[in-house]
């Protein structure tokens, strides 16, 4: 029999409950008020009193309201049908909620995440008599563009023998597809779906590997200078309006991955609506089908209850780990982890815990680290390799990278793509600062070449600061040429037009080719009689390179521009 209790105190979305029986941390409970059951989670236990955060508005909850505990952790349902869906933080399907509730969400309405009526064409890959363990494949169904493997539930701890398995055909997620037997002779029915607690990492794999293979984003500044590896982690901090969301959306469209999961936790509703409108219309360049076919969106906008923001981040990473277990490459984009941290700060304040820096909880770093640590590249039991790459945007107030959330994130990620107000105001997009950003991963271009090119950016910035004080006349022609070359590298290679059909996504082959051209210009010695002549020449090169960026790779126009560029360089270079 489930434990019962009653409300003895309410403070915002924190409810204090007096219990009659045993409870455990993170147990899910329902507060019964005004004929509705409001979902909540235990976050502190003190004697016979527990504190729970309610995932809904707590208006109307009063002292004496009854509470029922479920004896379960907060879980997600895993199975075919997750892709193309839009969920809230508690995995309620928003399109179905809209049909039931209209434009405004009602409290206490919880729907099943997966469609129980839809039939999936199951093809078995195992047979009666096979010995299986948790995470092993029984067969697969086609879900959009993905071979969705039907697995032994991850919570099964022993080895089992398959005693029954259905023939190929159409089945719903609740229909029995196999029966397995353990060593004691007990039989277990297997369906296509099962539940898993969101705060428990899925560890049904043989070993974790060190991320080494680059995950191509087709954004030049990232792939060349600040690469991200498959199974790695990266963060995108930046002030409001610097282009974090656009950069994440461009990455999700063009990244070299099988499944994209977007966790919009605490972002403005307008940006989420934009994603929901655009994604079904966009074509996946790899398959020619809608991008939505390989995407799952978990959205908890800033207008939704604060407590569910934390749940939305964990829901997203759990779904990502589930698809990783199929041997797929997953990209998870959390936008924005700052809002999630603010939700933690709010709850910590209500619990009257000792605050850390800027009133964030003292355990902020360990919570952020435990989230990013769930990324990784793993070898599965059958030898396949799957990965979850996690990218979180951070929204520090005023673009201050010294604030606690950014600093806690920097300690655990492998790449830092810092967006700056200075670059976004100058319309230099993506507004990633080439001087402040860094990456620990290997990219698509030789590191010695990229370090040489980056040295020009550093020198060019120093010379630019000098010119602000002494003017152009106060520096030598050689220094001025270094400055012009650094500006050429910035405008022709680092900057990219996300709204141009050709320049929006650049293949690794084209990146190598174009970088070699720019690298050749940086290494070539030129001689000019004055600064005006130098500026005119570099501007001519720059325009030529920009035209090449907007031309199809190696077509007639591209080759013509490249030939003209070569003649220009040969005309002015010092032999």
Swiss-Prot record:
GO MF, one annotated term: ATP binding
Gene Ontology annotations of biological process type: proton motive force-driven plasma membrane ATP synthesis
Catalytic activity from the UniProt record: ATP + H2O + 4 H(+)(in) = ADP + phosphate + 5 H(+)(out)
CDD domains: ATP-synt_F1_V1_A1_AB_FliI_N, ATP-synt_V_A-type_alpha_C, V_A-ATPase_A
Keywords: ATP synthesis, ATP-binding, Hydrogen ion transport, Ion transport, Nucleotide-binding, Translocase, Transport
Top-level taxon of the source organism: Bacteria
PANTHER family membership: H(+)-TRANSPORTING TWO-SECTOR ATPASE, V-TYPE PROTON ATPASE CATALYTIC SUBUNIT A
Database matches in NCBIfam families: PRK04192.1 (NF003220)
HAMAP family documented for this protein: ATP_synth_A_arch (MF_00309)
Family: Belongs to the ATPase alpha/beta chains family.
Function summary: Produces ATP from ADP in the presence of a proton gradient across the membrane. The V-type alpha chain is a catalytic subunit.
Record-given protein name: V-type ATP synthase alpha chain
Organism whose genome encodes this protein: Borreliella burgdorferi (strain ZS7)
